[in-house]
Amino acid sequence: MTIALTGGGTGGHLAIVRCLLESAIKKNIECVYIGSQNGQDKAWFENEVRFKEKFFLSSKGVVNQSKFGKISSLLHTLKLSKDCREIFKKYHIQAVFSVGGYSAAPASFAALFSHLPLFIHEQNSKSGSLNMLLKPFATKFFSAFEKEISPYPVADKFFDNARIRKELKNIIFLGGSQGAQFINELALNLAPKLQEQNIKIIHQCGKNDFEKCKKHYQSLNIQADIFDFSLNLEEKMKNADLAISRAGASTLFELCANTLPTIFIPYPYAAKNHQYFNAKFLQDQALCQIFMQNSINLDEFFKSILKLNLENISTRLQNITQKNGADMLIQKALFDNLTFIR
């Protein structure tokens, strides 16, 4: 059996693609990847040899474009979907699995036009525009945030490094692979207070702010573990007892898998404010704290760091997500829906 995996644009979407690829391989399913020349798709998968083939199309986003721009992008997507149909025929694709993002549009529409099963995984609490549009036509729609909860695909390594936190000795600031300037500034401002409490700092600051952050810690004579990007983020998480992070869905569930208590600062300009609602999913269960970027008071924030019941939160985070989530999605999609596979 050969399937197409499509979608991406951001690390969160692409992390799910990688998990699905690894699960498909376990079941001897071959995968063709269809992504975009734009975004991070090529950086992630151009050299990924486990795909049967990879295609990076000139996909364009529709959101935030003018009326004319949206029409132009839609026509371009329809043209690319025709190219995808040819890919489906050449590689005998039997189903399409989309993780969303504009780069998923051509292959997703092509699946509908070709009468192929279309499976969609929505990573966020608020569905993206493409997924909302295609949901009624999908063979199966998966989401960890809906009433019919589906497992969220998280790499095993985040579970393997999990532990129950009991005492705050190390704190990790996660600005993402691209960095988050606000979180970087917050970390630098909190650094003297953390040093007074003998709390060590681990800081992912992104490439743009790396030198600035490094020099600032040196000027404070603080030995921080500072890095721009790491392919082994789970190793950094393993050493932390508390995280300060944005609330992208993949990051959120990786933190849950690692049972790492977190204070979330949602990115305020995320589409549909989805990062806030992602974090609220945990806050409603008393499993995290949320601070809004525009109203943070440094002293109050620091007090909240010291007050958290790490052991209680860490223990209960074990129940939020489960290992082998991608395996379960592949099983539900392709094997529990065999009547759809032609």
UniProtKB/Swiss-Prot annotation:
Keyword Magnesium part of the UniProt annotation: no
GO terms, molecular function: UDP-N-acetyl-D-glucosamine:N-acetylmuramoyl-L-alanyl-D-glutamyl-meso-2,6-diaminopimelyl-D-alanyl-D-alanine-diphosphoundecaprenol 4-beta-N-acetylglucosaminlytransferase activity; undecaprenyldiphospho-muramoylpentapeptide beta-N-acetylglucosaminyltransferase activity
An annotated GO cellular component: plasma membrane
Secretion signal, residue range per the UniProt entry: none
Pfam families: Glyco_tran_28_C, Glyco_transf_28
Disulfide bonds: none
UniProt cross-references to InterPro entries, sorted A to Z: GlcNAc_MurG (IPR006009), Glyco_trans_28_C (IPR007235), GlycoTrans_28_N (IPR004276)
Binding site for UDP-N-acetyl-alpha-D-glucosamine: T10, G11, G12, N124, S177, Q275
Superkingdom of origin organism: Bacteria
Record-linked Gene3D superfamilies: Glycogen Phosphorylase B (3.40.50.2000)
Family stated for the protein in its record: Belongs to the glycosyltransferase 28 family. MurG subfamily.
Function: Cell wall formation. Catalyzes the transfer of a GlcNAc subunit on undecaprenyl-pyrophosphoryl-MurNAc-pentapeptide (lipid intermediate I) to form undecaprenyl-pyrophosphoryl-MurNAc-(pentapeptide)GlcNAc (lipid intermediate II).
UniProt name for this protein: UDP-N-acetylglucosamine--N-acetylmuramyl-(pentapeptide) pyrophosphoryl-undecaprenol N-acetylglucosamine transferase
Organism: Campylobacter jejuni subsp. jejuni serotype O:6 (strain 81116 / NCTC 11828)
Gene: murG
